[in-house]
Amino acid sequence: MRMIVSDSHIFWRTAATAALFALNGCASQNSVRPYPAQTPNAQYANGTTGPLGYNNHVPDFASRNFEPFNRQDVAAIALREWRMFGSPVSDDDPEDRPEPTDPALKPERIPGLWQRIGEYWWIGQDPYETEVAWTGKTDAGGTRFDAAHDGHYAWSAAFISYVMRVAGANDRFPYSPNHATYINAAASGQSSGVSAHDPGSYTPKMGDLICVGRGRSKSVTFSMLPTSYGFPAHCGIVAAVNQNAQPFGHELSIVGGNVDDAVSLTHVPTDANGRIADGSGHSYDSRYPWCAVLEVHYDADQEPDSGL
């Protein structure tokens, strides 16, 4: 069953976390870069990257870090995109979600939103990748693809990459159209900006990513990482932690792209300490056998002058 919740509901559920950030004090503001940061022009599944260069797809406020790269901005950007898609909540088992019979019912293809997904690709991906010109319903040549084949244009990793890019991660995130690229980069230590943790031994924080294998790769566990191959996966951005509410009691909230063809919020069960798996790594979530928590290394918890 799908639910729609109000913005105020999410606000109150995240207020306690925001207050903790305020009590912890504010990080000093980084100096604004005089020029945009250089990032790899391409990043590959084996961990190698292309040459560094300026990416003119990325706004100056992000590439020059008008604010330090921080957790608050990542969660806020993810929640902004969620509201744009109508604030859907996807708490049912993905195996029980039938595909819409009418392509017009797919949020990713409706006016205003298919273009937004194009922005996720354009900004989030490295500039020389073919995918930068994709949208929610067209390929790089502008040809509308059949809705039945939209799995070939899956945009959930593009959404994650977009949020990190716009928040000012610059060269500290392995942007990719595939979640496995940054899961493996974090697990292998090839990315200095992201570390991978066993879900049974690390408590997710706001702005971290929690990840799971999909389909034939649902059996991937933390002990198998990094893999020597790419694999289908999904990651969501932790938008709220330490929640005690329906439907699970102890829970956290994640925001992910391409969930039911939209940006959706999902509640994830935790234990009383906020972890998503027990000490052996067994997920508390019967829907998702989480394989990793990706800790993103931010400059700050929040904007120095955010007012919170």
Which ranges hold each PLM region?
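C-terminal motif of bacterial Sec signal peptides marking the signal peptidase cleavage site
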Residues: 22-25
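Short, solvent-exposed loop/turn and secondary-structure capping segments
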Residues: 90-93, 174-176, 222-223, 265-267
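Low-complexity, Gly/Ser/Thr/Pro-rich intrinsically disordered linker/tail segments
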Residues: 253, 258-308
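Bacterial N-terminal signal peptides that target proteins for export
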Residues: 2-15
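...with weaker cross-activation on analogous glycine-rich loops/strands in unrelated enzymes
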Residues: 172-260
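Bacterial signal peptide processing site
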Residues: 27-29
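Secretory-pathway/luminal and periplasmic proteins that interact with or process carbohydrate-rich
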Residues: 84-90, 168-172, 217-219, 262
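N-terminal capping segments
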Residues: 36-167, 305-308
